[in-house]
């Protein structure tokens, strides 16, 4: 039974990832005054399946001097961790209801750094290694701001459980009292998922393709799916944290539809940002976090922690 639950979680995620690639290409196409994919199937709807067949039927080549075990295991580990992060998300009920689901998601996203580092190092290519080091530095740096932003949010929630956020936001979405943190959270999720304008790991003009430069066929497709699964997961998390999802115990489907709509809108914002802004310079990226976001988030964190003490009130105890 558990395996059925697991597959019923994984298969829709992979389908969503497939169609997100199509939505991205269509969005970028229309923003650049062209059509995007429109040959395979009606309006190009079968393009993701054509891409999948092409990638998974090609021969996966491996550089002669690469580390065979790490080179092979890195993409599989990346996708496994990306899918594991979905387990505690309430939609409206999580697959496994954890007391510390938010910490679990942070821990899993930290572990994802290893797959990037292994893939870059095992490729035995200078471009892949530089791309991997950049990706690791960027991911670790922005996780600091994500964790600090989560503290006041969880303080208002009263626990680290994601399921209780629905109850907390019944009357007021947390985006209103926490709007500066919500804005910084959105930018940090862009950086965390290595998306434009923070996609320095795959600077085509300098690093060819970043840490996955030596990958082809199936393993490359796994990295590609990981990136898009992480994007959808981060946006679903943003919707749960700040855009309280409507929940009626008699109609649990309404919660799921609500969450899907909000996640889709946030994902389209990700694509919109990609189409609109140029890439940051590496030092600007680091300065944004360590000199702007970190002092701001720390100050706001102390402010939000002092409010309950000052007003002698307690967060919701659920």
UniProtKB/Swiss-Prot annotation:
Q: Belongs to which family?
A: Belongs to the complex I subunit 1 family.
Specify where it is mainly localized.
mitochondrion
Q: State the oligomer form and interacting partners.
A: Core subunit of respiratory chain NADH dehydrogenase (Complex I) which is composed of 45 different subunits.
Membrane topology term reads: Multi-pass membrane protein
Molecular function GO labels: NADH dehydrogenase (ubiquinone) activity
| Entries under Pfam families matching the protein | NADHdh
**GO biological process per UniProt:** mitochondrial electron transport, NADH to ubiquinone; mitochondrial respiratory chain complex I assembly
Task: List locations, semicolon-separated.
Answer: Mitochondrion inner membrane
Q: Which InterPro entries match?
A: NADH_UbQ_OxRdtase_su1/FPO (IPR001694), NADH_UbQ_OxRdtase_su1_CS (IPR018086)
Q: Name one GO cellular component term.
A: mitochondrial inner membrane
EC number(s): the record gives 7.1.1.2
Give me the segments passing through the membrane.
Answer: 2-22, 69-89, 102-122, 146-166, 171-191, 231-251, 253-273, 294-314
Q: Which UniProt keywords apply?
A: Electron transport, Membrane, Mitochondrion, Mitochondrion inner membrane, NAD, Respiratory chain, Translocase, Transmembrane, Transmembrane helix, Transport, Ubiquinone
Which reaction is catalysed here?
A: a ubiquinone + NADH + 5 H(+)(in) = a ubiquinol + NAD(+) + 4 H(+)(out)
Q: Which PROSITE patterns match?
A: COMPLEX1_ND1_1 (PS00667), COMPLEX1_ND1_2 (PS00668)
Function noted in UniProt: Core subunit of the mitochondrial membrane respiratory chain NADH dehydrogenase (Complex I) which catalyzes electron transfer from NADH through the respiratory chain, using ubiquinone as an electron acceptor. Essential for the catalytic activity and assembly of complex I.
The protein, known as: NADH-ubiquinone oxidoreductase chain 1
